[in-house]
Structures are given as C-alpha cells and as structure tokens.
C-alpha cells in the first residue's frame, strides 16, 4: 500500500487530535469513493476512522456485532483500495496538489524578483493557484 502525504491542516480535520497519514489516507479514500460503498460499510468506516469510535461503540450504535463492524470496515477498505488501484483518482489528486504547490512557490519567487506589471501578474496567478488548492 502506498501512503500519500496529504498536505492539510490536520487540526482542522480532527478538532486538534493528532492523526496519522494512514488515517488521513482512509479519510481521503472515503471522500473519493464512499458513495460507492453500501450504507452500512460507509457508516462503519466513517465512525471508525473519522469519528474514532471503537468497534464496540460502532456495534452498539449500528445494532450489529463487533465482528460485523470489523467485516464491514475491511470490506469497505478493500473495495476502496481496489477502486483506487483501477482509477488512480486519489493518486492523481495528490500529484496535482504537489504540482500546484510547486508552481505557487515558483510564482512567489518570481514575484519577489520582478516589479511592475509582471509582479502584479505573478501575485494574481498565486491567488488563483491558492484558490484551486483550497478547493481541493
């Protein structure tokens, strides 16, 4: 499994809790492919990875066994990893994000070196890139 470094403010996503890259990847997979899961798989996966509930807590909330929760989470993870392997959407998203950040840094350097209209154009381009990055 490839671990992607998703550059986000982790505290914004987690309410201040520390989050591993693996959990961030799982959250991104759910964002990209969650609608392709069954409702039960999506709910169990979301409660486990995004809400940080234990298997017992999820089982109680969903009215199924801990084993059922575990199986739903594993099936969801497997299905989303299979879809990602076939489509590569998350990988391409990350590659585009990295490329946009590099362009933004290049534009920042260019803006520092130039004056006049070229400087204004570089600053405008940086703002547009920031907007694209913020949208995800």
Question: Positions of the model-derived regions?
Answer:
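Residues within the DNA-recognition helix of helix-turn-helix
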Residues: 72-75
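Helix-turn-helix DNA-binding elements, focusing on the entry/boundary residues of the two helices
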Residues: 55
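Short amphipathic alpha-helical boundary/capping segments
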Residues: 28-37
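C-terminal flanking helix
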Residues: 77-84
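Helix-turn-helix DNA-binding motif, specifically the short coil turn and the N-cap/start of the second
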Residues: 65-66
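Hydrophobic positions on the alpha-helical face of helix-turn-helix-like DNA-binding modules
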Residues: 58-59, 69
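Intrinsically disordered, low-complexity basic tails/linkers immediately adjacent to helix-turn-helix/homeobox/MYB/SANT
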Residues: 86-113
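Short amphipathic alpha helix immediately N-terminal
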Residues: 39-50
């Amino acid at each position: 499994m490839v671990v992607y470094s998703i550059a986000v403010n982790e505290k914004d996503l987690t309410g201040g809790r520390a989050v591993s890259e693996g959990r961030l990847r799982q959250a991104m997979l759910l964002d990209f492919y969650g609608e392709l899961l069954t409702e039960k798989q999506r709910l169990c996966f979301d409660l486990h990875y995004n809400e940080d509930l234990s298997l017992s807590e999820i089982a109680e909330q969903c009215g199924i066994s801990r084993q059922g929760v575990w199986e739903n989470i594993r099936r969801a993870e497997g299905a989303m990893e299979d879809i990602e392997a076939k489509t590569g959407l998350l990988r391409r998203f990350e590659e585009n994000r990295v490329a946009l950040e590099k362009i933004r840094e290049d534009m920042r350097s260019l803006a520092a070196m130039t004056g006049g209209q070229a400087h204004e154009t570089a600053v405008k381009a940086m703002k547009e890139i920031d907007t694209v990055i913020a949208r995800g």
